[in-house]
Amino acid sequence: MVSFGDPVPVLDSNVAYLSTLLSTNGNYYQPPVDPASLARLRHANAYHGMAMKFKVDQLCRFFTPSALLSRIDFEQAVWDYVVTGNCYFQKHYNRLGAVVRLSHLPAVYLRRAGIANVTDPLGVPDNFYVKVHPWGSFTQYAPDEVIHLHNYDLLQAIYGIPSYLCGVQDVLLSEEATLFRRKYFINGAHMGYILVTSDAGLTPEQADLIKRKVEESKGIGNGKSFYINIPRSGSTRDPVKIIPVGNIGTKDDFLDIKNETEQQIITAHGVPPILLGIIPENTGGLGNPVQALQIYHEIGSLPLRQVFLELNTVLGKAEVEFSEPDWKLLAA
């Protein structure tokens, strides 16, 4: 299973999909990308998080709830699909065996069942799932009890992957740039220094005191300071010297990094910038918001809507419905 950490090229990460094989206990298949990591990544960058919220809000805005599928269950499933590329529904039956309700199951914990759960010599059916609990146990669902909708991945057909996966490195880089800048200010607005004393006539006690003060002066993070005492160097120059480790003014490209990564993140999500509250940097602006919303509805919301309309095909009846926007009213 892949988590996020070291930057690696896309073409060198083929090992990622080896983890769609069975877990060590054989109870379920591991997803190619850790869904819990994807869920936490939602909070790493403002544009990344708000782009996903915008997608969810726009789809839920026109959803028509019913006795079969409530607005809450639908919204939670949409969040799962947008964030992880997977969503799951549990079927609830009446005494006659008809499906009367669908409830959301959390994608972070749902897994395709493995061989250890099946006695059928023909293997594991495609519609057999388990819910993995954080403490290690799991809940087993009956075959055909769970409906799984997923965003198709060309490298494996068991789990889906989110469409924004191509922008994950930009989300992480933007987060690292922000954290570095925060640590820089916590550190006292410097990147650290080397304090050197040579032939300064310091006693060992005085040298230890200076060392402790230097260690106590630095904050949490990147700016680390060092103290070097040379009791007898033979030099007659600069008995006390401060050597800067780095210059934040010339070495830091914070704004350039933030601007570039944010453009990449917005592109990965396919949401017009004006709909995310971005302030234009030029007099031309970012266009008409209503027109941008119409464009996103056609190229973003409608394709996502088709994913959930597939529930009607699975159930054999038209239970999932959406209303249409009134663009004239929005433009007024």
Predicted feature locations:
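Extended, charged amphipathic alpha-helical segments
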Residues: 2-3, 10, 131, 136-264, ...
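Short, surface-exposed loop and linker segments with low hydrophobicity and enrichment for Pro/Ser/Thr
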Residues: 79-82, 118-124, 186-187, 219
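Aromatic side chains
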Residues: 81, 88, 128-129, 185
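Active-site and NAD+-binding cores of ADP-ribose-processing enzymes
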Residues: 32, 95-160
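Flexible, gly/proline-biased loop segments at the beginnings
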Residues: 1-115, 158, 248, 289, ...
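Generic hydrophobic-segment detector
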Residues: 16, 70, 75, 87, ...
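Short linear motifs in intrinsically disordered/low-complexity regions
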Residues: 7, 13-15, 26, 35, ...
